Amino acid sequence: MEAYIRQKRATPGMVQASDLQLVRPMSAVNRNGREVHAYDGPMQFMMSPSNPDQIISSGSPTTVTATGTTTGSVTTTPTSPYSDATLEKLTPSSQDSEDEESTPVDILPSSNSFDRHSDGHLTHSAPISPALNNNVSRDSQQDSGSSGNLKSMEHSSPQASGHNDAEGDVAGPIEQWVTQPAAQGVLYKCRITRDRKGMDRGLFPIYYLHLERDYGKRLFCLAGRKRKKSKTSNYIISCDPTDLSRQADGFVGKLRSNVFGTTFFVYDNGKKDDPVSPRLDLAVVIYDTNILGFKGPRNMTVLLPGMTEDDQRVKINSSDSHGQGLLDSWKSKHMDNVVELHNKTPIWNDETQSYVLNFHGRVTQASVKNFQLVHDSDPDYIVMQFGRTSDDIFTMDFRYPLCAFQAFAIALSSFDGKLACE
C-alpha cells in the first residue's frame, strides 16, 4: 500500500500545495518528510533559504507587490480643484468596488522605482501594495507647499517605521483618552474590523477600533456607523458599541461628508449653537477630484488644528460667525493654526506594474484604501498609516499630533464611496 501511495504521489497530474497559499495551523511534527513552514509575514518567508521565488540581484531590495494593475498611456499631472465652483461642475463617476480593491500578494523582485508624476503611469483605483523597502525615496513626495503649527515634526524620530518609538497604551478613562493628542515619541498600533453581518450591515456596516497590546490582546476604543437617514455620508462615532447615537453617553463625535464625497469634516460632540460647549473642528479630509477619469491611487489632504506649546489643540470653531473653520483657513491661506498633511506618494514599480509603499510589515494586502500621512517638513515621520490585512480587517497606526478619534475618523473617510474621485 505504501508503495502504491508513493507511486501515486509521484504522478505528474497530482496538484501539490503551494508555499504561497494561506498556511493553516498544523502540528509541529513533520509528516511524510514534508517541511512545515511557519508564516510570519512577507519578510519571514523571503528570508527562508528554500524560497522558490528567490532571485539574487545586485543590491535590489525585494518588494511585496500586487500584480494585475494595468497602465494607461496618458501622461498628466494631477490637480487639486478644491474650490466650490469647481466642485459644482463635477460629474459622478464610478464608486469603490470591494471586488477590485484587494489583490493577492505575490513575491516578486523589485526594479527601479519611479514617481508616478514623472513617469506618467496612472491607473484607475490602483491598489497600493505593501513594500519591504526601508528606503522610500523622498523625491517621490508631492511638491506641494504646506504649513502649520506642528512643532514636533522637526524634533521627532527620523525612523519612519517607528522601531525607536515606544508602543502606546490607554492612559486614563477611555472617553478622555480617545480625544487627547498622542504623546510624543509613542506609536499607537490599532486594528479596525468591519462587521457586515445582519440585515442592513451590508450597506451600513459597523466599524470597531481596537488598540493592539502585547501577546495578541486588544482593547476596544471606538465604534462607528453611517447614519441611515442622511442626505450625505454621516458617521456617528462612540465609545459605546451598543448605542451608536448622538444621545448616547459614549458619543465622541461625527464624520460628515459633502455631496460628492470629496471633503469630510470631523467634529467633536459639542453642539453647533451652544455657547457653553460649542462644536469644534477636529479635522478635514480632502480627496482630489478626478474630473477626467484618470486612473491612479487616491490623493488626500488632511487639515488638523495646530498645537500649542503644552501639546494641546488650538480650538477652532467653524460655526462661529466671528472665526474661520479649518477648511476656510486653508482656502484663505491662513495657516498659522492649521496643520496640513498629505498622503505619501506611492512609488510606481515599472516591472510589477503596481504602486508600492513601505508599511513595515503592518499591511499585507494591496488596496486603494492603503495610505500613509506625512508632513511636508518631515516626510520620514509617518503621522498615520492605514492598510488592509484581510477582507474586513485593517491596521491603523498613528502618532502625535493625532488622537485616536481623529485617526479613526480619517480611516472611516477612506471606506466611504466617492463619486467624483474615481
Swiss-Prot record:
Entry's Gene Ontology BP terms: protein localization to cilium
Domain of life: Eukaryota
Keywords from the named record: Cytoplasm, Nucleus
Entry GO CC: cilium; cytoplasm; nucleus
Transmembrane segments: none
Keyword Cell cycle tagged: no
Protein name per the record: Protein king tubby 2
Organism: Culex quinquefasciatus (Southern house mosquito)
Annotated gene: king-tubby2
